[in-house]
Amino acid sequence: MDVLAEEFGSLTPEQLTAPIPTVEEKWRLLPAFLKVKGLVKQHIDSFNYFINVEIKKIMKANEKVTSDADPMWYLKYLNIYVGLPDVEESFNVTRPVSPHECRLRDMTYSAPITVDIEYTRGSQRIIRNALPIGRMPIMLRSSNCVLTGKTPAEFAKLNECPLDPGGYFIVKGVEKVILIQEQLSKNRIIVEADRKGAVGASVTSSTHEKKSRTNMAVKQGRFYLRHNTLSEDIPIVIIFKAMGVESDQEIVQMIGTEEHVMAAFGPSLEECQKAQIFTQMQALKYIGNKVRRQRMWGGGPKKTKIEEARELLASTILTHVPVKEFNFRAKCIYTAVMVRRVILAQGDNKVDDRDYYGNKRLELAGQLLSLLFEDLFKKFNSEMKKIADQVIPKQRAAQFDVVKHMRQDQITNGMVNAISTGNWSLKRFKMDRQGVTQVLSRLSYISALGMMTRISSQFEKTRKVSGPRSLQPSQWGMLCPSDTPEGEACGLVKNLALMTHITTDMEDGPIIKLAGNLGVEDVNLLCGEELSYPNVFLVFLNGNILGVIRDHKKLVSTFRLMRRAGYINEFVSISTNLTDRCVYISSDGGRLCRPYIIVKKQKPAVTNKHMEELAQGYRNFEDFLHESLVEYLDVNEENDCNIALYEHTINKDTTHLEIEPFTLLGVCAGLIPYPHHNQSPRNTYQCAMGKQAMGTIGYNQRNRIDTLMYLLAYPQKPMVKTKTIELIDFEKLPAGQNATVAVMSYSGYDIEDALVLNKASLDRGFGRCLVYKNAKCTLKRYTNQTFDKVMGPMLDAATRKPIWRHEILDADGICSPGEKVENKQVLVNKSMPTVTQIPLEGSNVPQQPQYKDVPITYKGATDSYIEKVMISSNAEDAFLIKMLLRQTRRPEIGDKFSSRHGQKGVCGLIVPQEDMPFCDSGICPDIIMNPHGFPSRMTVGKLIELLAGKAGVLDGRFHYGTAFGGSKVKDVCEDLVRHGYNYLGKDYVTSGITGEPLEAYIYFGPVYYQKLKHMVLDKMHARARGPRAVLTRQPTEGRSRDGGLRLGEMERDCLIGYGASMLLLERLMISSDAFEVDVCGQCGLLGYSGWCHYCKSSCHVSSLRIPYACKLLFQELQSMNIIPRLKLAKYNE
């Protein structure tokens, strides 16, 4: 007791016995959060914002089209809206369409974009409503989608899976995802050093009208402004003078009056002096001479150089800082701040980190589509203007009606092409990106879900730079630390963590007003001197200077109180930067943020009472935000906060509490049980393999006709689950089976991670899978009124039965469901006309069109069964026939399996059950795994999973293996002992071969195993004779073309090294492309059938065997006027 008293001496007994306040059920906030935000909601929210808000802004910015030909004519957009997805049945008859129908019929799931316009026709003014101008592909589960707000029963009627995440598009029947794109944030000053170590600052400005980049460079201690519209760098002082700050003293005051700042800025002032520039006019003239001449189209009054320079400064340099009526005050201060930052960075080498995640913005589908739509809409309008300019001046009967000239396909095709190819090349925004969209991978439910949270950074994969690839501390909680691919894309492709939310743009008007009320002073009212006082902080809003504040701490705390009370949007963040003396307020889109519980007076604001109300359904997540119990923090604001991971680590400085620590992992890493007991790269491997595991795709998987679909015949829930598994509904659509594993060495076939499988388990369906492939064909109509036909099967003349190739065809020429189909058998006996174009005048064409056979045949080494045949029509009104082919495969030697800990292995041996070892309760293992896989891999999580699984089976309950928590090993082992098993999880095992007990106890229990998509049947390839290439007469290459295996240059060198010359001859010529060739001994050229065309004789012609490729090379060289001659000599001389 005395020792205790010394330790807790200062505390009273009452304080000692008071319980630490813990919120037991606080993880219940997660499902509530995931209902409203997170995972796929990012894409959906962003798309909704685009089609409900952003598209109207784009229309407002380009609302009027006028023509130079007729000043009276105009076209004005009054409103624009996106409708509901539909499909045109016949001319002008539409009906609503479901996503599943678009998938089956290879159509685009899109909705009409309609506008209300007002325009002139002749002298009258006309208003037209609901005029379609194109079609917009619709994201599934967005506000305009058919599936929004439906019950599970209605989902079933629409053939959709209620667990399907949505957030993707269906374009031409293919599911496409727009990946999240990572960008450096716009409108922020970034100070960095170049390769030589010179410090400079750069700003990428971006507004709705213009995008440009401005650089501040230092050369020989002088400061210059660099911009691509200027032909050379311009001294910074001249820029200040051109903006109207003519006195040197005021310039220095703006930049800073400290000694070292003034010393650093001195040379720049002298340079301006040398250039003899003192007034604003002189400065503007100097800049005007340095402007790059743009080719001006069309007339228009020529601007003087001074006007041109002033325009340039106002609108192009630092575009995002607004200039009203040439009042350059704000822009001057911004430029001064840039100079000051560079000077300070030179002094103490504090350059910004480009990889810091607060400097990054993520672009979502909505932002990318809005850029694309803006580009297409402007093109559409300029096309209209062009037509108006052409048509109005012409004399004709009817008046010019612009509606007749609106081409709908322009916007439609632009959207569809961009999404289906993934190429966003918009000249207008200097944007050229490939691979923005990807096909949604439907290998398993997890691969589809994991694709929704993927972030792609626009960085060349080829450069081996470690900076952008490494794990940044600022990514904590925002990005998953484990889920990134291995290889060249490592660290460039990232995934969001479980609770991350990406913000969308917000109106900044209210924030500006509020800041003014909280004591932010306008910059225009201050002299330069006041800006560099030590207690004056600059206030930035989204990169623009808002004003200055004397008491920044009060501003920040009041601002946060207002946000918690719900007066400001919950996603606005405010943070201070003490080194640069700034307060940053951000309300722009693309910032990463996540929710935290607020801590007041060392107690979390959320209590157990709140959690009970949540469980009973009185509260939802929004209520927690409004009552200031939970708030969102972004990366920059996290730096000002002190966040505790658990309740018992809260101290007096703590401001927030983490909701659940396991949410800093993403979707794929969340499936791993006990990941905190594994070596880090193992979790990364599992993240990649979990996406390749076969299982279930969705409740509608039997109705889908995909190009390739792998399904497990009997998937099971994992015995050891995690909180994440429940949150993302993995146990409703699992991918894997609980296998009983014995960790022991058995035979020599389990070396290097190979597994030994039990034949009896395979017979009972362990690891059995279905492989579905599809074959499809379209029957088109051609321009000359001919069309494709399907012919009936061809009958054998003698037996009056169909020939073998047509055995499985029905009378209509299409294969019948349920039939077994072998290689080279015909699935659809289609024939097409020989002439499909309209014939030329005067050419004789047979009256009756002639047909040639183009059958759709089955290609595959193993037989398949026809599951079903679908006949429909696609968007072009061509007939569409889709067949689904099925194979059932049982595991065989060489198939790949993996546990959930990155322990992959192939099946090395299949043993009959009577030879397998068994434990004393008579259980035989399904899998025997070699124990050498554990020590070097350090996957302790797998050992614990086996224990927890075993205890769970005996107890009849599921154990949790959640990251940083989960069931304790001690408790699990005590459960085992209670049921009469060994505390260590080891069993007494009898050998199946000798019937004697094994000399060691064997670690024995259930582990969740995944069957991966890599199967031997799809990879095995060998050939003796087979097809050859036409040009070189060598065997073709590749498994699909039944090609040969190439003996390359290195293999050739090896054989030369061994001196095996006959083997070389046999491999490189005789077995490849031997060719008899005639050579003339006199001139050394190739002859033909015993005659030399050059010597005009057959006296000296001999016959040789050389590779055909060699003969081809000689002839190709001859065609280039290089003549290789073959010298012949007698063999025996």
From Swiss-Prot:
It catalyses: RNA(n) + a ribonucleoside 5'-triphosphate = RNA(n+1) + diphosphate. A zinc finger (C4-type) spans 1080-1095. GO terms for biological process: defense response to virus; innate immune response; positive regulation of innate immune response; positive regulation of interferon-beta production; snRNA transcription by RNA polymerase III. It is an enzyme of class 2 (transferase). The record marks 429 as: Critical in trapping poly(dT) in Pol III-mediated transcription termination. Pfam families: RNA_pol_Rpb2_1, RNA_pol_Rpb2_2, RNA_pol_Rpb2_3, RNA_pol_Rpb2_4, RNA_pol_Rpb2_5, RNA_pol_Rpb2_6, RNA_pol_Rpb2_7. GO terms for cellular component: cytosol; mitochondrion; RNA polymerase III complex. Disulfide bonds: none annotated. Its main location: nucleus. GO terms for molecular function: DNA binding; DNA-directed RNA polymerase activity; DNA/RNA hybrid binding; ribonucleoside binding; zinc ion binding. Its cofactor is Mg(2+). Zn(2+) binds at residues 1080, 1083, 1092, 1095. It is found in: Nucleus; Cytoplasm, Cytosol. Component of the RNA polymerase III (Pol III) complex consisting of 17 subunits: a ten-subunit catalytic core composed of POLR3A/RPC1, POLR3B/RPC2, POLR1C/RPAC1, POLR1D/RPAC2, POLR3K/RPC10, POLR2E/RPABC1, POLR2F/RPABC2, POLR2H/RPABC3, POLR2K/RPABC4 and POLR2L/RPABC5; a mobile stalk composed of two subunits POLR3H/RPC8 and CRCP/RPC9, protruding from the core and functioning primarily in transcription initiation; and additional subunits homologous to general transcription factors of the RNA polymerase II machinery, POLR3C/RPC3-POLR3F/RPC6-POLR3G/RPC7 heterotrimer required for transcription initiation and POLR3D/RPC4-POLR3E/RPC5 heterodimer involved in both transcription initiation and termination. Belongs to the RNA polymerase beta chain family. Catalytic core component of RNA polymerase III (Pol III), a DNA-dependent RNA polymerase which synthesizes small non-coding RNAs using the four ribonucleoside triphosphates as substrates. Synthesizes 5S rRNA, snRNAs, tRNAs and miRNAs from at least 500 distinct genomic loci. Pol III-mediated transcription cycle proceeds through transcription initiation, transcription elongation and transcription termination stages. During transcription initiation, Pol III is recruited to DNA promoters type I, II or III with the help of general transcription factors and other specific initiation factors. This is DNA-directed RNA polymerase III subunit RPC2. It comes from Mus musculus (Mouse). The gene is Polr3b.
